[in-house]
Amino acid sequence: MKNILVISASPRKGGNSDVLCDEFIKGAQQAGHKVEKIFLRNFKVNYCTGCGVCNSTHKCVQKDDMAEIMDKMVNADVIVFATPVYFYTMDAQLKTLIDRTVPRYTEMVNKEVYYILTAADTNAANLEKTVESIRGFTLDCLDGAVEKGILYGTGVWDKGEVHMKTAYEMGLHS
């Protein structure tokens, strides 16, 4: 049994990336894994100020919910990053989360990672910039991270226009 953390960065409750997270979770639970989903919109996560204190203390001086989220990331075997794609990159919520991991990202080792991306664009190749920016964190900064799957929810503008079966199967095989 794996401990899976699904991070939904969507600012819209019930949006397409949220719905795909839920399908991934159904598959992962069917496979017997323990899954927790967090909605970044429900947490207070301030922007990184670049003060540099965390480089020596491994703690952020800001008083918000980021320490709780980092605990979950450190303890997870699998992390799923789900984001809508805005102007060909991840949304601000996910970027802020990634920026704020500096105090503890070296503790996030040997993680399996999945990406769920949703966009109005119909061409998955146009989302590669988004994937590369997330990989800049997961594969370049997290020791031993292994990319296990990417779901491109393309051509989805309105809520509900998503690739449900693919998300379920990705979770089932996590």
Give, region by region, the residue ranges found by the protein language model:
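Short glycine-rich anion-binding loops that position phosphate/pyrophosphate groups of nucleotides
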Residues: 85-87, 120-121
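Short, glycine-/small-residue-rich phosphate/pyrophosphate-handling segment
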Residues: 92, 105-148
